[in-house]
Amino acid sequence: MHTRRTTLISAALLALVTVALPVRAQTTLLNVSYDVSRELYKDINPAFAAHWKTQSGDTLTLNQSHGGSSKQAGAVIGGLEADVVTMNQSPDIDILVKNGLVSADWRKRLPNDATPYTTTTVFLVRKGNPKAIKDWSDLTRAGLQVIVPNPKTSGNGRYTYLAAWGYALNKANDEAAAKDFVSKLFANVPVLDGGGRGATTTFTQRGIGDVLVTFENEAVLLDKELGGDQFDIVYPSLSIEAAAPVAVVDKVVDKRATRRQAEAYLQYLYSAEGQDIIARHHFRPRSEAALKKYAKQFPPVSTFTVEAKLGGWDAVQKTHFADGGIYDQIVTRR
């Protein structure tokens, strides 16, 4: 009897101890990003999940959503609960600020105005470059087909438009001449896809176009995936620096109690491991060590920024991409 009673007491104590053990949290994060970053974050996410597990002991599940950058921003405004956004142009985060989703000081929260990496705009042409495309001026030739995503919905397309505009300004130092130049270029665009990956599909799978204008990382990815025997990459004489801004979606993380994880996720992008993954995916990292390590894969290219050459994103948005702006005028003339 005494033995049975002792056994029951021991079992009860064991149950109490079991109940008292801490339960590790299982949390999900959603990263809403632009079209051609999906391969990057497919590698970043498991690496960060392992890092977080080591640091906190908690299991973290990371999900990702991709599309044209501006369309993705619209989805977040429409109710898609992103814990973080990783875009390719700052207007797509600023519009979240205007809608009360992101704090106005988002640029100050992380280094380099919250841009952990950059890329630039290049040309992808058919193998052997049969149309002898070397620079932006070649894209205005009659009969040439240029594939580019829609600048209204895609940051990739917007950078293409602005890179061409900047090139024309350098040549003529005249706004009217720049408008005429970009009008001729877009007259050669047979279809405007909603995002960068859609434009890639049009060029590589549907066989439409003589040249795809896209981000450097996308061009290199395609060249590698297809064995290097279908396309060549051409670097124009002048291009644009495309900095990739990131931000915590404050309204969502406060609602979901995921701020700590979301902030750590974005900080991880600046870590040595994060910068190495970024460089391996042919984005240009901010880390000097990573840039040096992968120097051979990043040819020197002359670039300008929206801020230095075009007056900043606010001016660009109002002048070029607002309803009735220069881009709309150009498209209407097509």
Give the location of each predicted region.
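N-terminal export leaders
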Residues: 4-8
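A conserved helix-loop-strand patch within extracytoplasmic ligand-binding domains
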Residues: 97-170
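Periplasmic-binding protein-like
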Residues: 115-119, 181-186, 193-194, 226-259, ...
